[in-house]
Amino acid sequence: MKLMDVRVSGLNVWITDKHILKGISFKAQPGTVTAIMGPSGSGKSTLIRVINRLIDLIPGARVEGEVWINNMNVMKEDPYNIRRYTGMVFQEPNPFPHMTIYENVAIGPKLHGLAKNKKELDEIVEWALKMAHLWDEVKDRLSDYPHQLSGGQRQRLSLARALALKPRVLLLDEPTANIDPVSTVKIEQSIVEYAKEEMATVIIVTHTPQQAARISDQILFLYEGRVIEYGPTKELVLRPRHELTKKFLGGEV
């Protein structure tokens, strides 16, 4: 099992002439969950899109500073190599609509040659669906299509698809923002279990302090593109040092 950390140093991002991220630095370790927390428009989603080079797809984006995944310089590495080790789950569920539940989870391992035969592929699919807390709900309907699932189930299917490749770095952009409370709890459980059991580096964007407090080991609090506070979750939540952090935790900003 290869352990991979994420290190960000002096990161600045502009989109056309707008300065989105301003001097961001932090480190995320294997076996931990890092929550990037802050109000809408603080640059949270932009930050994780730099880590897996999705920033390249945004017209007018310019990046300065350093981002490392282990010994890979993210901004100089081939994006394909970066994405071999990183998984991504977005805010909106995005399973492949014309593939079955089984095919959605199996497609990644098949393309990357992770299974020698059908039995091994079946085992990967079952493991990923169990890790996403979806297996018990779909094990007898693997040939169904995503439109036959609820929104929360579709999001857990998106998570299972990402987990099937066992990414060493898992990035999640507000994955529970638009789903039901039951699926939210299950996805939060999956995130923590995956980080701990697979010693993966997990980074989740959230605008909800309560979610950050429940699942993360450390919090990076962003406000208007700057790091306001960064540290262990319990310490930051119980003893915030900055007035803006106190206000955000109290629902005032």
Curated annotation (Swiss-Prot):
Keywords: ATP-binding, Cell membrane, Membrane, Nucleotide-binding, Phosphate transport, Translocase, Transport. It comes from the Archaea. It is an enzyme of class 7 (translocase). It is found in: Cell membrane. Its EC number is 7.3.2.1. GO terms for molecular function: ATP binding; ATP hydrolysis activity; ATPase-coupled phosphate ion transmembrane transporter activity. It catalyses: phosphate(out) + ATP + H2O = ADP + 2 phosphate(in) + H(+). ATP binds at residues 38-45. Pfam families: ABC_tran (PF00005). GO terms for biological process: phosphate ion transmembrane transport. Residues 1-249 form the ABC transporter domain. GO terms for cellular component: plasma membrane. Coiled coil: none annotated. Disulfide bonds: none annotated. It is a peripheral membrane protein. The complex is composed of two ATP-binding proteins (PstB), two transmembrane proteins (PstC and PstA) and a solute-binding protein (PstS). Belongs to the ABC transporter superfamily. Phosphate importer (TC 3.A.1.7) family. Part of the ABC transporter complex PstSACB involved in phosphate import. Responsible for energy coupling to the transport system. This is Phosphate import ATP-binding protein PstB. The gene is pstB.
